[in-house]
Amino acid sequence: MMAVMAQDHPIFTESIRRIREALGPTALDPLEQQVLERLVHSSGDLTLGGLLQFTPGACDRGLEALRSGAVILTDTAMAAAAVAPMAKRTLGTQVRTVLEWAPDCAPQGSTRTAVGLERAWNDLSGDRSSPLLLIGSAPTALERLLDLVAAGA
């Protein structure tokens, strides 16, 4: 069950309660369940549960990374704006967007977001833990991330 924080707005708390009720029982562990509830809350799509797959322990590792100071890196300013208030009031996590690293003009065959993601990943992954990526609506950022992971980044 998701822990309700003192700062959670009553409308948010009620929304999560209704989402949980509509979803019914799942086989997800508590952290995975919270991810699902947040995704449904953000998208309004109750069918997302059937599409989610988690690597065992991924949520625990992500939470530990956040507790260790990992940055949340988003593909869009809109995604950053959506998660920044909760990130700030829970663990004080810094939220940044790949657009901070994006060139003014994308090279031919690429996008500003894809170039920005690669630059941000390389910059933020240095001596610290890699950033946690939140991809909202830029498919080229996701494609570049998958390329980086495949290359061993």
Model region roles, listed by residue range:
Residues 112, 117, 121-128, 134-153:
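Glycine-rich phosphate-binding loops that contact phosphosugars or nucleotide phosphates
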Residues 81-82, 104-106, 141-144:
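Short, well-ordered, mixed-charge alpha-helical segments that flank or form enzyme active sites
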Residues 45, 77-79, 137-140:
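Short glycine-rich anion-binding loops that position phosphate/pyrophosphate groups of nucleotides
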Residues 72-74, 97, 134-135:
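General beta-strand structural signal in soluble alpha/beta enzymes
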Residues 2-6, 49, 107, 129-135:
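Flexible, glycine/proline-enriched loop segments at strand-loop-helix junctions
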Residues 2-73, 81:
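Electropositive, gly/pro-rich neighborhoods at or near active sites that engage anionic ligands
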